[in-house]
Amino acid sequence: WRMIWEKRVEAIVMLTNVDENGRRKCEKYWPGDTERGSHGEFEVSCIDNTTLGQIIRRKFKISHQSYPNRTQVVVQYHYTAWPDHGVPQTTSELFNLRRIVRTEF
């Protein structure tokens, strides 16, 4: 969250799932839909969660303890259909993801 705050990142694209075939593939670094997470000096809350086919778009509001009057919004685009091994069978959803991100940013 520090890098997102310092560089004022507006979008994150995630291509892996947290768990695949019963194995942990990455850490879930974001809070759930109605949760608020504390990460050191940062507080992160999910303010929107929308499913767009095989893509989940989550919006997070980030605040910093030292800057109480400043908040930042970052959008995570989570592509949920990348297989554990190999590549997706078609490219249509990946191009859809690319189109969505480019349209919004």
Curated annotation (Swiss-Prot):
Keyword annotations: Hydrolase, Protein phosphatase
EC number: 3.1.3.48
Residues holding substrate: 84
Keyword Lyase set for record: no
Domain of life: Eukaryota
InterPro entries tied to this protein: Prot-tyrosine_phosphatase-like (IPR029021), Protein-Tyr_Phosphatase (IPR050348), PTP_cat (IPR000242)
TM region(s), chain numbering: none
PANTHER family for the chain: PROTEIN-TYROSINE-PHOSPHATASE, RECEPTOR-TYPE TYROSINE-PROTEIN PHOSPHATASE
Family: Belongs to the protein-tyrosine phosphatase family.
Protein name: Tyrosine-protein phosphatase 12
Gene: STY-12
